[in-house]
A protein has these predicted regions:
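Charged interaction segments
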Residues: 27-114
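Short, extreme N-terminal segment that most often corresponds to the first beta-strand
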Residues: 1-29
């Protein structure tokens, strides 16, 4: 069963390794082509932000994260977090910390994993 939500999927990938960023981009392209899921990539030198602005299913979200975890270690820091009435995003940790939204901006903070 797939669960659909109107909103945006956001995955922030922290890396300065161009070869890894290229692999991440290929993973997003694969998702776009196979699942008709719109996902744009913005490169800010140390991060790749993937925004999916179409309705999406958790199945597709899981597939995207499976692809990413095959590229580098990604561990879940929280489950699905709802932001606002119609906006959702998944939050994941990278290199011992996590990104969170605070006052409309992404903030990086330490995060221990049990």
């Amino acid at each position: 069963m797939s669960y659909y939500a109107n909103g945006e999927l956001k995955v922030v990938y922290l890396s300065t390794d161009k070869s890894i960023l290229d692999k991440v981009e290929k993973a997003f392209l694969h998702i776009n082509q196979r699942y008709d899921f719109e996902c744009d990539i913005l490169d800010y030198t140390t991060t790749v932000e993937a925004w999916g602005n179409e309705p999406y299913s958790r199945t597709v979200t899981k597939k995207l994260l499976d692809l990413l975890s095959g590229i580098a270690q990604i561990q879940e820091c929280s489950s699905l977090e709802f932001c606002g009435e119609d906006r959702t995003y998944w939050r994941y940790i990278f290199e011992g910390g996590r990104w969170k939204e605070q006052s409309g901006k992404l903030v990086y903070e330490d995060c221990e994993v049990n």
